[in-house]
Amino acid sequence: NPAATGRTPQLNIVGAIQTHAAGYEDAGSSMIAEADIALQLGKTRHGVGASFMNDEFGLFSHKRFSLMYAFHFKLFGGNMSIGASADMLNESVNGSKADLGDANDPAFPTTDLSGSKFDASAGIWFAHKKWYAGLAAQHLTAPTVLLGETNEMKVERTYNFICGYNITPKRSFFTLAPSAILRYDGTEFRADVTARLIYENERKRLYGGVTYSPQHSVTGFVGGTFHGVDRSY
């Protein structure tokens, strides 16, 4: 969500790698790297950032480079932000590795093809004392990327909603932080529900939890903040 750009006053750098169906050949992986920072210009607060994503699955590869901006302001006792991003998409297919029963089938390329297209995303974000929520739309232009002279790939608009709440009992070092992410691309719907338990005491911060996505996966994770760097597995 580009509206979340600059939501913290510190420079924020994020990197993550996820493998798909470990142990399977050409199962693919996803990687994202992102950096953003908040800027105070007079009495107004802004956020700027950049991100790069690479998603590979089988013969296909999807890359996106984004420049993000968000405008922040106070609203209803919380912090509201509106953001947008300019995106460059690159879609590619490794046709030279395709194992086809009919090598002359014109529906499948037999060489490596790639194509690029400009795109855009936008979103809103609201954070209160104990809860937050955001709504975003990706691929606003719903671009059709040309792959060579005879092939093309349609990129559908994607909508996502995120929300979360922090529950901290009085005089406790522990916080229970449930959250959810909902995604819809006009055809498929996916929900990821997470329960995270956080321990914070002075400069120590440790956490662990589980994420459940119906019909997709169950993921466990642990992590902590060490010398200002958040690491998780």
In which residue ranges do the predicted regions lie?
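Subset of outer-membrane beta-barrel
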Residues: 1-233
